[in-house]
C-alpha cells in the first residue's frame, strides 16, 4: 500500500534537486525519457491492452482516448523531444531596478515547485505533463484515472528508468496509485506538499476537486464551445469551419458543441448546413419542439445547451443578431473557446472584446485551442480559470517568480 504522505515528502525534496539542474541537463533527461518510452513501446502497449480489455463499458469517445498503439507511443516520445527543444525562461531575469534606498531589486522566474495533475483516460497525458513539468523545473505528481492504470504505470516505469540513468530521484515524476474517490479526496488536501493542482476531466471530477481541494487549483473545465455564424459570414468558410470544429475530433474539449446561426441565414443556408452535418452522421439538437418538428429528422432531439457532448452531436440555436449570440455564450459558455464567422470587422472586434473565454476566434476553428498548435509543444491543460494561467498551459504557465534584493547594509 502506497504511503501518500511519505511519497509527497520525497517529491517536495526532489523539487529542490530538480531546480538546481541547468536547462541543458533537463533537456538531456527528457531525451532519455523519450528514448525509454520508445524502447519500452511493446511493454506499454501490452499494459494498455489490459486496460482496453476491461473498458467495454466506457463511452466510445473515452475508449478512443484510452487506446494506444506503437504509432501513438512513438508520437508520445517525439512530443517529449519537441518539449526538450523549447525555450524555457526559468532562472532568467524578468526585470530589475534600483529603489530609492539603493537596493538592487531583481525579479527572477522560478518553478512553482510540486504540481499535481488529476486526469482521466488519456495515457499520453502522463508523458506530456511529465515532460512539461520537468522542462520547467517542476516536480509532478500524477493522478490518472483507474481506466488507464496499467498504461500509466508502464509509462511511469519508462520515465523512472531515464531518471535513474541520470542519478535523479524517481520522485521527480510520481503517481498516486490509489484510483478511488477517497484517494483523490486525500490527495487534494495535501497543500503542505503540493503547490498547485490542475484537474482536467469531466464536469463531475472538476466539481469534486473544486469543492474539496485545499491546494490552489487551475481547472481544465469542460469545453462548451460555440461557433457563431454571423449574417455577413462567408458561408463556404462557415461550413468548413463548423465541420472541422465538430468532426476532426468530436471528443476533444475544444470541439464545437453548439452552432449559433443568424436568423436571416435560416432559409438560404440552414438546409445546406443540415445536409452536410447529416452526411457526417451528426445528430442535431434543436432549441424547441417547433424547430425540431420543422427541421429535425428521426435521430435529432432537443438541445441541452449546458452539455459537452463529446460526440457527433451538436446543439443548434437561431439568434436575432450578435447581442443574442453574446448573451447566449455568456450564459452557457464554459470560458474555454468561442468562434465567430464574419466578414464584418466591427462585429468581429465586438465579439473578440466582449466574449469572456480563454480563446476567442474570428474565422477559425476552435480546434486550434491546443498547446501544440500554439507552439507550446504540448499542454498541461487548457485553463478555464483566470488566475494564474489561462488557455493552453505550456512551460511558461508553470513558472512563478521571486525577488532577489542586494544591498550594502541598508536598514529601514
From Swiss-Prot:
GO CC, alphabetical: cytoplasm
Gene Ontology biological process terms, A to Z: L-proline biosynthetic process
Localization: Cytoplasm
Keyword Cytoplasm in record: yes
Top EC category: oxidoreductase
EC nos: 1.2.1.41
Keywords: Amino-acid biosynthesis, Cytoplasm, NADP, Oxidoreductase, Proline biosynthesis
GO MF terms, alphabetically ordered: glutamate-5-semialdehyde dehydrogenase activity; NADP binding
Pathway listed: Amino-acid biosynthesis; L-proline biosynthesis; L-glutamate 5-semialdehyde from L-glutamate: step 2/2
Alphabetical list of InterPro entries matching this protein: Ald_DH/histidinol_DH, Ald_DH_C, Ald_DH_N, Aldehyde_DH_dom, G-glutamylP_reductase_CS, Glu-5-SA_DH, GPR_dom
Record function comment: Catalyzes the NADPH-dependent reduction of L-glutamate 5-phosphate into L-glutamate 5-semialdehyde and phosphate. The product spontaneously undergoes cyclization to form 1-pyrroline-5-carboxylate.
NCBIfam families: PRK00197.1, proA
Family: Belongs to the gamma-glutamyl phosphate reductase family.
Record HAMAP family: ProA
Protein's name according to its UniProt entry: Gamma-glutamyl phosphate reductase
Species in which this protein is naturally found: Helicobacter hepaticus (strain ATCC 51449 / 3B1)
